[in-house]
Amino acid sequence: MIRLVQRIARPFALQTFLLLALFLSISSAQAQPLDLTAYRGRIVYLDFWASWCAPCRLSFPWMNQLQQLYGSQGLVVIAVNVDRDRAKADDFLRETPAGFKVVYDPSGQIAGKYDIKAMPTSLLIGRDGKIHFVHSGFLPEKRDEYLAHIAELLRSAQ
């Protein structure tokens, strides 16, 4: 699992965020604050998306299901939108509603902290604050693989 993260993330970013993922608090005049310290002790599925991204549209119903089915077990889904034009994100959300927290990052500040290069990119952060899994893109046929990683963390010690 760690090898997958190492191949995707830059070594420095990996080292930093393995230790600090749940302690990150970012805000600016352009971005909404994202204070992951509020989710300490929970599992966070952090998804970066954009309105123009077709796979993002496919992932939203699945993320809604994740939040609905596993929220009571400690899973929190947070989607970070990177559109520069908030109206485009709002249009997307009218067509594809989100039953989870959505944060806007038009400046790319939050995405930059995680070195996000593709849409969608999702990070699975454990109760321990470490990034356990990173995947770029969303392939419906890989949902079982994604879910296996989530289930593993849900079974982990509270």
Where are these regions (language model features)?
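N-terminal secretory signal peptides that target proteins for export/translocation
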Residues: M1-R10
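Short, internal strand/loop/helix patches
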Residues: D90-D128
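Conserved redox-active cysteine motifs that mediate thiol-disulfide chemistry
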Residues: F48-Q65
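Thiol-/selenol-based redox modules, centered on thioredoxin-like
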Residues: L124-Q158
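Boundary at the C-terminal end of the N-terminal hydrophobic targeting segment
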Residues: A29-P33
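Short pre-active-site segment immediately N-terminal to redox-active cysteine/selenocysteine motifs
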Residues: R42-V44, F48-W52, A118
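Conserved helix-turn-beta segment immediately C-terminal to the redox Cys motif
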Residues: R42-I43, F60-V80, R94
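Bacterial N-terminal signal peptides
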Residues: P11-S25
